[in-house]
């Protein structure tokens, strides 16, 4: 009966306090209840004291998955091939995972069959993102530079052949690459050379 009451919570994700307020019970009792429903598969635990109904999670759109990605590791922003796919810059199909950049350690979380991956960059290279529909996501050019940087360091498998450089602003790419290691700038140059667009740099 209590689980049916949880359907009244309109938030995408909720805490022990939300459950306690709804059911008029103590927070400790709400925590026990949530843990029980996680074991039964009715709730999915996103992180400490944060849950989503499993049935709801299974039908989430990509924007809500991005919001959850922002939440699982703070601070972070959507980037790499996930952002490039979002902007239509790559032909690579994104299924079953969401990629982000963070200043914390490189890590992956599996939630409800979705892999939320975070790759670490230094504080100096963290940025170039915008807030769109309540979520943080890299600009197209920053997502590209993040991908190139990590690939040039041997930390990311970038599918260069899937990238449509014509959809990116070359001046922004060059400007963003300026504070990255020489390897990154060289990688960018090679990408343009291999696609016959080297004069654009």
Language-model segments: residues:
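Hydrophobic alpha-helical interaction segments
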Residues: 125-201
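A residue-level signal for conserved active-site and pocket-lining positions in enzyme catalytic cores
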Residues: 19, 83, 144
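Residues at alpha-helix termini
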Residues: 22, 39, 85-86, 179
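Short gly/ser-rich loop at a beta-strand->alpha-helix junction or flexible surface loop bordering the NTP-binding
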Residues: 45-55, 65-125
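Hydrophobic alpha-helix position signal
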Residues: 37, 83-84, 160, 177
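Short beta-edge/loop segments at beta->alpha junctions of small alpha/beta modules
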Residues: 1-73, 112
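Hydrophobic/aromatic-lined pockets within catalytic cores
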Residues: 24, 38, 88, 149-153
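Residues at the C-termini of beta-strands that transition into short coil/loop
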Residues: 10, 120-122, 148
């Amino acid at each position: 009966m209590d689980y049916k009451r949880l359907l009244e919570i309109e938030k995408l994700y909720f805490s022990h306090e939300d459950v306690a307020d709804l059911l008029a019970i103590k927070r400790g009792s709400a925590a026990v209840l949530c843990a029980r429903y996680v074991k039964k598969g009715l709730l999915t635990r996103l992180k400490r004291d944060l849950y989503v109904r499993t049935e709801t999670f299974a039908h989430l759109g990509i924007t809500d998955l991005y919001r959850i990605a922002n939440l699982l590791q703070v601070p972070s922003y959507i980037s790499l091939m996930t952002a490039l796919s979002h902007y239509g810059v790559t032909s690579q199909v994104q299924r079953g995972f969401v990629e982000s950049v963070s200043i914390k350690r490189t890590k992956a979380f599996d939630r409800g069959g979705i892999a939320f991956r975070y790759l670490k960059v230094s504080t100096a290279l963290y940025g170039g993102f915008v807030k769109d529909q309540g979520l943080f996501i890299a600009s197209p050019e920053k997502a590209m530079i993040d991908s190139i940087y990590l690939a040039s360091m041997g930390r990311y498998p970038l599918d260069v052949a899937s990238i449509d450089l014509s959809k990116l602003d070359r001046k922004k790419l060059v400007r963003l690459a300026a504070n990255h290691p020489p390897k990154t700038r060289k990688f960018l140059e090679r990408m343009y050379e291999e696609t016959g667009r080297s004069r654009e740099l």
